A protein has these predicted regions:
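Non-catalytic terminal extensions of PLP-dependent enzymes
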Residues: 1-22, 34-71, 83-99, 105-108, ...
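Conserved phosphate/anionic-ligand binding catalytic regions in large, soluble enzymes, centered on
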Residues: 269-282, 286-287, 331-335, 416, ...
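Conserved PLP-enzyme active-site core in the AAT-like
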Residues: 112, 142-307, 369, 382, ...
Length: 947
């Protein structure tokens, strides 16, 4: 290996030979031939450009970035230029300790980012006036659609009995939000009615309504009047609110809102041509068991110390599966953390000061335009003006001066002011409009200006009064606070994270560096395409790369998570079936081992789930599949299949399985969660799939960010290409296409720069090698630990794919549960593998290609050592190393030590541990206590523990 491959892949030539020798093999090709069925192997290498060196790639991506025109955009429409404080950019966005962590399932080693997320939830609850917020969602439009479906599933018994299924959407909502709401509503049988608020009668044949606050073109709606009408007729209210406007406007809770959604992008998150950004979703506590996404809640550890955890997880899709109200299984953690630190850094006074500046500059612009005879329609507004003028002429002058407005038609346009806007910008805007409208300009000067927020809507309540938002306003203080939280969390900067089905590989610095460049991160998603040629070229190349890798003909980058990719793929199948007059087909076959998002996505796409069992080897039960496919042949829509399977096995009969589906009129959807075992060796097209999603945050090196962002593009066969998702503002597909799946045309486009770099630097050979070494590493771990743990499933030749499942259920006879092993691994400095998925009481281990032999051996040594510790445990005595794990520094430095093992055995169980000891900040967290006493904001926590 040479070039970037040798940096990305952890195993060197000598280590490779040693590992192969341990497995009794003479080559990696020998291993692959025993692992992947020959009938699905690729016959030639991927047709991709040669691999770039790291410096070569950075030169290339910089050159490409210069094709983007970095104009100042006053377009608004849910996206505004923001200012990322340098202390946050350097210490979080560019810090692998933050961006390489995983979703905080292991609470004891995730207290830092969960505190940041608790701060985020507090900001959202304070600004919206609601009781409960989640830890972020994918984008504002997705949040709005989730609100509609949550309230639909929460209708009263009378409404369900009367089939009340209409949902009203104000026509001054964001266009992308209306489109996404319509996408989600149709397969669920929800009738969306779009109209003017002042013409809507709020009749009780509607179960809910949606309002924008302020509206799309800036006017502040009379939520008080409309809220009263809605409540008097039993309608639930969803409000999409601007986060900065809420600093000056009354909270939506004052007007009876049941759900408040929006985006926190304005709190220091770059535009990124559409994302990733953290959306918010706030609601009443009565919906706590229905709210989508993650919630961080306060609990306590076994010593009664305050401890954070993900609350109410039993409501989520991985538990409820096809009964879940949402398929959301990720937050936008990295972006939510950044937004929370923005709130901590600026504090309530600083945030209000920024909001006032935005409003005052908007008023100044309004007054200046009126002076030169330009008509502005909004009487009340926060940051956006609706203006009359010759738009074509004004657009020409604006683009000559490198600024963008939102052009509505040939007589109207709007301008949205943002945090980065200066007095000079206001003068330039006035000059541009004056020239385009053939008027004489005026000199703008900022003096005292009258607020354009109605008196009845001026915010009276304070916000962010908790101590944390009032003490870290210097850079030194915030830097230390960030570092304090960082030290509480285990990430890839500390050790291997072997989470099965999660692919925690290297996120190389050279892939990450460009996302900090303004030429990539400061582009508005709705600029004219000629201003984003760098992005357009990158997107086109990345789509072609993914087509080549999957064997398919078309790709959409729009889905901004794996679960959204699943939904998008199924909606594409649905649209295709409708186009051939087969819309009655609605049965989706799903193996029992599938990830919980699969059945949840199928239900959201209007399909009925029929579960297929697995045999004792972990394969799909082919006989049952045939019987159920034939039973439902008139209505069969799709099979959802993960390949290799979630059991870590390449099923040799996969082509026969997909043929059964096609023979019975269905389409095959392949879940791409395990694509890291396919790239360069086989592909979804060869196995017989029609569509798949990919997890760019797994296989293609986008970091997990502590629980997001994710990107879940879909790749489709030729007959499905016309149905790929579209966008109402920028047309990216055909007339037959599915409507919006995400808010932005290309989803989280900024993150795609990372995957583009990954593919460009590895090239065809490097990608293939990455897959081979991922499989080698998994099989080496299997070889090392199989004498100590039962390996549940393996292929016909005794090989694992890129992951393996160990059975921990026999240890119950020693009083040990799988979670005890997970917590004990913390004492050894490791994050646990995936626990109890896809089989309860097991662990699924996936090492990826990025780890070296020393680290893999340390992990194996830890697992073997723990297995020996299990033998010394008994049901009768829970006072043991595993049941007491993890052990904190506070615990072992205490004078009192009432344990039947030494302090050294507790925290330094093997020699390597002391060289790089990771100390958890809390002991075992009490999950049940946290759910019984739900606390999801950062009010002084000591008072809660006392009570």
């Amino acid at each position: 290996m040479k070039g970037f491959s040798s940096r990305h892949i952890g195993i060197n030539k000598e280590q490779k030979n040693y590992m192969l020798d341990s497995l009794g093999l003479d080559s990696i090709e020998h291993l692959i031939s025993e692992t992947i069925p020959n009938n699905i192997r690729l016959k030639k290498d991927l047709n991709l450009e040669g691999a770039f060196g790291e410096n070569e790639f950075l030169t290339h991506i910089e050159k490409l970035s210069k094709k983007n025109k970095n104009y100042k955009s006053f377009i608004g429409l849910g996206y505004n230029q923001s200012v990322t404080p340098s202390v946050i950019k350097r210490n979080i966005l560019e810090n692998p300790s933050w961006y390489t962590a995983y979703t905080p399932y292991q609470a004891e080693i995730a207290q830092g980012r969960m505190e940041a997320l608790l701060n985020y939830q507090t900001i959202i609850c304070d600004l919206t006036g609601m009781e409960l917020s989640n830890a972020s969602l994918l984008d504002e439009s997705t949040s709005a659609a989730e609100a509609m479906t949550m309230l639909y599933s929460s209708r009263s018994r009378e409404q369900k009995k009367g089939n009340v299924s209409k949902f009203f959407v104000s026509n001054d909502a964001l266009k992308q939000t209306i489109s996404l709401i319509e996408t989600r509503a149709e397969p669920l049988g929800i009738e969306v009615v779009v109209g003017k608020l002042d013409e809507f009668d709020f009749s009780n044949d509607f179960y809910g309504c949606f309002m924008q606050y302020p509206g799309i073109h800036g006017s502040i709606n009379d939520l008080n009047k409309y809220g009263e009408k809605a409540k008097s007729n039993g309608l639930k209210i969803v409000v999409a609110a601007d986060i900065f406007a809420l600093c000056l406007l009354k909270e939506p809770s004052n007007f009876g809102a049941d759900v408040v959604v929006g985006t926190s992008q304005r709190f220091g998150i770059p535009l990124g041509y559409g994302g990733p950004h953290a959306a918010f979703f706030a609601t009443k506590e009565e919906y706590k068991r229905s709210i989508p996404g993650r919630i961080i809640g306060l609990s306590k550890d076994v010593d009664d110390n305050p401890a954070l955890r993900m609350a109410l997880q039993t409501r989520e899709q991985h538990i409820k599966r096809d009964r879940a109200t949402s398929n959301i299984c990720t937050s936008q953690v990295l972006l939510a953390v950044m937004a929370s630190m923005y709130g901590v850094f600026h504090g309530p006074d600083g945030i209000k000061r920024i909001a006032l500046k935005i409003h005052e500059l908007t008023v100044l612009l309004d007054n200046s335009l009126r002076k030169i005879g330009i008509k502005q329609f909004n009487k009340n507004y926060f940051d956006t003006l609706l203006i009359e003028g010759p738009t074509e002429k004004i657009k020409l002058v604006a683009e000559e001066n490198k600024i963008n407005f939102n052009y509505i038609d040939n007589k109207h346009f709007s301008i949205s002011i943002n945090e980065a806007t200066s007095l000079n910008d206001i003068q330039l805007i006035v000059d541009v409009i004056a020239k385009g409208a053939e008027k004489d300009s005026v000199i703008t000067s900022q003096g005292t200006s009258e607020s354009k927020i109605p008196k009845d809507y001026v915010r009276e309540s304070k916000f962010l009064q908790t101590k944390i938002f009032n003490i870290h306003h210097s850079e030194t203080s915030l830097m230390r606070y960030i570092k304090n939280l960082e030290r509480k969390d285990l990430s890839l900067t500390h050790s291997m994270i072997s989470l099965g089905s999660c692919t925690m590989k290297l996120n190389a610095a050279s892939e990450m560096i460009p996302i900090s460049w303004s030429k990539w991160n400061n582009i508005h998603p709705f600029v004219p395409l000629n201003q984003a040629q760098g992005y357009q070229m990158l997107i086109d190349r990345l789509e072609k790369q993914l087509n080549e890798i999957t064997g398919f003909s078309g790709t959409s980058l729009q889905p901004n998570s794996g679960a959204q990719g699943e939904y998008a793929g199924l909606m594409v199948i649905r649209a295709y079936l409708k186009s051939i007059s087969q819309e009655h087909r609605n049965i989706c076959l799903i193996p029992s081992s599938a990830h919980g998002t699969n059945p949840a996505s199928a239900v959201m796409a209007g399909m009925k789930v029929v579960v297929i069992g697995t045999d004792k080897y972990g394969n799909i039960n082919e006989q049952e599949l045939k019987e159920k496919a034939e039973l439902h042949r008139e209505n069969l829509a799709a099979l959802m299949v993960t390949y290799p399977s979630t059991h870590g096995v390449f099923e040799s009969s996969i082509q026969e399985i997909t043929k059964v589906i096609h023979d019975n009129g269905g389409q095959v959807y392949m879940d791409g969660a395990n694509m890291n075992a396919q790239v360069g060796l086989t592909n979804p097209h060869i196995i017989g799939a029609d569509v798949c999603h990919l997890n760019l945050h797994k296989t293609f090196a986008i970091p997990h960010g502590g629980g997001g962002p994710g990107v879940g593009p879909i790749c489709v066969a030729k007959h499905l290409v016309p149905f790929l998702p579209n966008n109402p503002i920028i047309n990216v597909s055909s007339k037959e296409s599915v409507k919006s799946i995400s808010a932005a045309p290309w989803g989280s486009a900024l993150a795609c720069v990372i995957s583009y770099g990954y593919i460009c630097m590895l090239g065809a050979k490097g990608l293939k090698s990455s897959t081979e070494y991922a499989i080698l590493n998994a099989n080496y771990i299997k070889h090392r630990i199989e004498k100590h743990y039962d390996i549940l499933y393996q292929g016909e030749n005794g090989r694992a794919a890129h992951e393996l499942i160990i059975d921990c259920r026999p240890f119950k006879q020693n009083g040990i549960e799988v979670m005890d092993i997970a917590k004990r691994l913390i004492d050894y400095g490791f994050h646990a593998p995936t626990v109890s998925f896809p089989v309860p009481g097991t662990m699924m281990i996936e090492p990826t290609e990025s780890e070296n032999l020393d680290e893999i051996d340390r992990f194996c040594d830890a697992m073997i050592s723990i297995r020996l510790e299990v033998d010394n445990c008994s049901k009768e005595n829970k006072n043991n190393l595993l049941c007491n794990a993890p052990h904190t520094i506070k615990m072992i430095s205490s004078e009192k030590w009432d344990y039947p093992y030494t302090r050294n055995e507790a925290v330094f169980p093997l020699p390597f541990v002391s060289e790089n000891k990771f100390w958890p900040s809390v002991r075992r967290v009490d999950d049940a206590f946290g759910d019984r006493n739900l606390i999801c904001t950062c009010s002084p926590i000591e008072s809660y523990i006392e009570s």
